[in-house]
């Protein structure tokens, strides 16, 4: 980002669980507005902490209440309007809820890490999967 101060602040989570064989599955979401596969996240509301944003956005986009695990690496990039953006992510586990398709996310899939890596649209999301695996 060339040191530009982020104009857009956002937060989200990588929701994960163990499958029946002890492997790791992660939730990947499809956003029809961008036609991409990524992880649930969204912009911070005024006065909201990154953690509050992550919890709210994950619930709004997926229907899942979560418990926070380790903070993962932050991601910096330019958004679709070419504004510098900073997104902070956490490893998360589901405590309650169920997915219902909505305007922001029309599909959500629990996938093994290798399949998630193949499906996500952005390289920085593949890097986040590496961070998740190291953190859990």
Task: For each feature predicted by the language model, list its residue ranges.
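Unchanged
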Residues: 42-131
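Generic C-terminal helix-cap and adjacent flexible tail
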Residues: 134-136
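Residue-level signal for short segments within beta-strands and strand-turn junctions
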Residues: 15-17, 30, 93-94
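Short, well-ordered strand-loop elements centered on a beta-strand within folded domains, enriched
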Residues: 22-28, 98-101
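A residue-level structural signature of the nucleotidyltransferase/glycosyltransferase Rossmann-like core
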Residues: 6-8, 36, 108, 121
């Amino acid at each position: 980002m060339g040191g530009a101060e982020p104009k857009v602040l956002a937060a989200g989570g990588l929701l994960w669980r163990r499958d029946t064989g002890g492997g790791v599955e992660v939730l990947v979401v499809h956003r029809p507005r961008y036609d991409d596969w990524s992880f649930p996240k969204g912009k911070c509301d005024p006065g909201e902490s990154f953690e509050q944003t992550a919890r709210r956005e994950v619930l709004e986009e997926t229907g899942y209440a979560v418990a926070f695990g380790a903070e993962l690496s932050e991601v910096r990039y330019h958004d679709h309007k070419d504004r510098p953006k900073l997104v902070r992510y956490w490893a998360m586990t589901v405590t309650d809820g169920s997915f219902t398709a909505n305007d922001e996310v029309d599909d959500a899939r629990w996938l093994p890490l290798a399949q998630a890596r193949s499906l996500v649209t952005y390289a920085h999301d593949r890097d986040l999967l590496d961070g998740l695996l190291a953190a859990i």
